[in-house]
A protein has these predicted regions:
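Polar-ligand-bearing catalytic/cofactor-coordination segments
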Residues: 1-67, 81-163
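Hydrophobic alpha-helical transmembrane segments
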Residues: 68-77
């Protein structure tokens, strides 16, 4: 198993932020997150392909179109886009959950919410990300908790019991 951290990230982070980043990535390794994502994909991708095939064939037959003709292509594209959207929403929810757990793992290991907060701020600036995108956008497209959600979780950790 490997954890890859790019040199450009290393040079931009202080030691507390880098510790938070490394601990976060190790949290993914410890939790076998790659297998959770792979399991989800192996379950839903065949269902998505089946949906696209059945919906396209049903529409073509209903319209009386030839299944080998070009008229099927727009329907195929539409149903493929719908499948990606409907598979993406729960997949992204799983991804956000995985990322939040890796953040918590990092906080538990480093005991340094300030390092996590600094890391999130720098990553947002470096990646030119919206720190607090609209809720609907996060729900449909967000693969990670928003920067503000992650900072809020780190600050709540700092204020938790025994702090």
């Amino acid at each position: 198993k490997r954890v890859v951290i790019y040199d450009t990230v290393i040079k931009d982070l202080d030691s507390d932020e880098l510790s938070s980043l490394i601990a976060h990535e190790l949290g993914h390794v410890k939790s076998n997150d790659i297998y959770r994502g792979l399991g989800f994909a192996l379950l839903v991708i065949p269902l998505g392909v089946l949906f696209v095939q059945l919906a396209t064939v049903s529409l073509a037959r209903w319209r009386g179109d030839d299944l080998d003709g070009p008229a099927v292509i727009p329907a195929l594209a539409l149903f493929a886009a719908l499948a990606v959207l409907f598979i993406g929403v729960p997949g992204n929810a799983l991804s956000r959950n995985i990322e939040a757990h890796a953040d918590r793992f990092a906080l538990d290991r480093t005991g340094d919410p300030g390092g996590m907060v600094g890391l999130q701020r720098k990553l947002t600036l470096t990646n030119l990300s919206d720190p607090d995108p609209p809720a609907a956008f996060r729900f449909i497209f967000g693969t990670h908790p928003s920067t503000m959600q992650r900072i809020g979780a780190a600050e709540a950790y700092d204020e938790g019991p025994g702090k």
